[in-house]
From Swiss-Prot:
The protein, known as: Large ribosomal subunit protein uL4
Domain of life assignment: Bacteria
GO molecular function: rRNA binding; structural constituent of ribosome
Lineage, top ranks: Bacteria, Pseudomonadati, Pseudomonadota, Alphaproteobacteria, Hyphomicrobiales
Gene label: rplD
Gene source species: Brucella canis (strain ATCC 23365 / NCTC 10854 / RM-666)
Assembly and interaction partners: Part of the 50S ribosomal subunit.
Length: 206
């Protein structure tokens, strides 16, 4: 698969041949769903907690005698049906993380890259670098490239000026190549890779 390399100014900078094993797969939604679910589960804090009937600060003694009142039979006022009682089956502190094999994670990343390539939402940029940390200039360059909602992946190190300028633009994310992940790829409309990022990805999956 051949793609044209462009500069931030929108000029042609040659062509690059992409590895079909990384960018040319037929995307599988089930694999992408598994990886996204795994990522989001790892992010979930899991510190939610509601007081059950054993946690409520209230007497545990019987409310009133069993017989002779004409009222319903009850024991403790900690029961869930009473105001101030404990919650029934409420959330508890737990870890939402679950296992996903490394091979499935790697396959998910390749399928996400292939999905963007298949949808023509993959752009290769010569270099993600800026002489000045000027957001206005970068917005103008992105407009020429049609980037309104995009994830930009640079090399191992992101140019400081480019990072600073891009951080002020809504719906634009910038990550080094080691931070690339399925969820961020899929949540943005366009995927922009630098030449260095393409080389690093092909080396990673070699």
């Amino acid at each position: 698969m051949d793609l044209t390399i462009t500069t931030l100014e929108g000029k042609d900078a040659g062509k690059v041949k992409l590895n079909e094993e990384i960018f040319g797969l037929d995307p599988r939604d089930d694999i992408l769903q598994r990886v996204v679910r795994w990522q989001l589960a790892r992010r979930q804090q899991g510190s939610h907690k509601a007081q059950g009937r054993g946690d409520v600060s209230r007497t545990g003694s019987k409310m009133y005698k069993q017989k002779g009142t004409g009222r319903a039979r009850h024991h403790s006022a900690r029961a869930p049906q009473f105001r101030g009682g404990g919650q029934a089956h409420g959330p508890v502190v737990r870890n939402h993380d679950h296992d996903l094999p490394k091979k499935v994670r790697a396959l998910g990343l390749r399928h996400a890259l292939s999905a963007k390539a298949k949808a023509s939402d993959l752009i290769i940029i010569d270099d993600l670098a800026s002489a000045d940390a000027k957001t206005k200039q970068l917005v103008s360059q992105f407009a020429k490239l049609g980037l309104e909602n995009a994830l930009l992946i640079g090399g191992a190190e992101i140019d400081a000026n480019f990072q600073r300028a891009a951080s002020n633009i809504p719906n634009i994310d910038v990550l080094p190549v080691q931070g690339i992940n399925v969820y961020d790829i899929l949540r943005r409309g366009k995927l922009v890779l630098s030449k260095a990022a393409v080389e690093a990805l092909e080396e990673r999956f070699k």
